[in-house]
Amino acid sequence: MRSRTLIALLTSVVGSLGVVGAAAVGARAGVKGQRAAAQRVVDMLPIHADWWRERQQHEGQLLYVAIGDSAAQGVGATAPGRGYVGLLARRIRHRSHMSVRVVNLSVSGSTTWGAKRDQLPKLRHYAPDVCTVSIGANDIADFDPDKFERNIRAIYGAVPSHAVVAELPCMFVPDRERKVAVANEIVHRVADEFGLTVAPLHTITKRVGVRRTFFNSYGDLFHPNDRGYEVWASAFEPAVDARVDTVAAIRHYLSVREAENLGREAGAVANARAEQDTDGAEALDHAARQGPGPVERLRHRMTGSIAVPDERDQSDEPDDHPGDVGRTA
């Protein structure tokens, strides 16, 4: 009995040592792999920076400017254009049916202070149609709430009023998450003061969960991979879509001078005109089903035009270009 017990005990100990040994080997391999991935990230940095710098020379009907750090550079993706900035640029192009010039001012490793110092002076040279800001993750390691808020205020005060600014992403580590919570409170409060739209990046990355985030991360376990950047882009998409629609409305319903004079109100005025135009089109369609009389009365109410009586003989050919007196193009 004793011998059987001793054999069982030895088997258990050897088995446990085997598990511990395997775990240690796995841990060493994991650390080694993470270090190798970190080195690959270092090698990526100049490649991504050069790629975006070359893209700045491209022409486009719309201008998209990005402020940020290595995530805006797309570090960790299989190609620079597969980062969230590249994905958003592609979405803007598809939604607007216009070509897009991307000026990516982001700098890998940048903090809020670095963005204020290095990126804001360059931003002054551009008048972007779309602007995104995602900065602050690199502040967390040595987090100072007062300095963070001063830098965020400087950045948010310098970007266009239509800029979309992002929360810091979920980091899942309790100590870091406590700092992130303070940082995101500042992001929301200052963005609200400046009237900026906040992309819910923390909310969305937290919803994904730690397990999926692990598989959505590059080998360094810090930067997203292609799947991770799709998650990041999804946090910006609703606000970017709304901005693209507003730009389209401004270009359709306002002259350049009118848009300049209206300033921050240009989007609201253009969207109101677009909504009025849509409502008017629906009303005209409804009136058309009731006959020509209701159509003319409604057109007069909408445009202030007066219908010209039709005095042609029945045999006259119809006018190829009918119009109303006072109708605007």
Question: For each predicted feature, which ranges?
Answer:
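Short, charge-rich amphipathic segments
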Residues: T11-A29, H48-Q56, P80-R95, W113-D129, ...
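A structure-centric signal for secondary-structure junctions around beta-strands
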Residues: E59-Q61, S99, P160
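Conserved SGNH/GDSL esterase-like catalytic core that processes O-acyl groups on lipids
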Residues: L63-V65, A71-K147, V295-R299
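Electropositive phosphate-/nucleotide-binding environments in soluble metabolic enzymes
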Residues: I7, R82, D226, E230
